[in-house]
Amino acid sequence: MFTLTQLCPTPLENARQLHLSLTAEERCRRRLHCHSDEGESLYLKLPRGITLQPGDRLRDEDATVIVTVHAKPEPTLKVMASTPLDLLRAAYHLGNRHVPLEIHTDYLRLGADSVVQTMLEQRGLTVTFEVAPFCPERGAYHAH
């Protein structure tokens, strides 16, 4: 088992390279037992305040392994609107409910939630279930 304790801003040439696919919720956890995409047993033991993003690299204390983080496909809702203003209003209502949200110019993505889906559909938005990588916006006061 490799214990990953810190971010690695630059690649290390001699370290073993692994990949780790995590859901949006898992990327917020400081402590997590998991397996790399290659099947290696991993333990995340990260400092407070770290929210992992796709492309982040983690390393163990000895720098024997570097693990690149990826967004794991998960159940999501893709929200589309007939006008940009309707999409903006949807983002407002979702933000007002503190719903983690991935924002694009022509659609929004959020974790699958039937109650929120119903609310959005009642507002006339097109909501589609998709299994896709989910990368919600980080908070305005987040520092990485």
Curated annotation (Swiss-Prot):
Q: Where in the cell is it found?
A: Cytoplasm
The record's section on CDD domains has: UreE (cd00571)
Q: What domain of life does the native source organism fall in?
A: Bacteria
Claim: Cytoplasm is one of the keywords in the record: yes
Transmembrane residues, as ranges? none
Query: Under the cellular component aspect of Gene Ontology, which terms does the record hold?
Result: cytoplasm
| A single GO BP | protein-containing complex assembly
What Pfam families does the annotation carry? Answer: UreE_C, UreE_N
MF annotations from Gene Ontology: nickel cation binding; unfolded protein binding
Question: Keyword annotations for this protein?
Answer: Chaperone, Cytoplasm, Nickel, Nickel insertion
Question: What is the similarity comment for this entry?
Answer: Belongs to the UreE family.
NCBIfam families, alphabetized: PRK13261.1-1
Per the entry, what this protein does is: Involved in urease metallocenter assembly. Binds nickel. Probably functions as a nickel donor during metallocenter assembly.
HAMAP family registered for this protein in UniProt: UreE
**What is the protein name given in its UniProt record?**
Urease accessory protein UreE
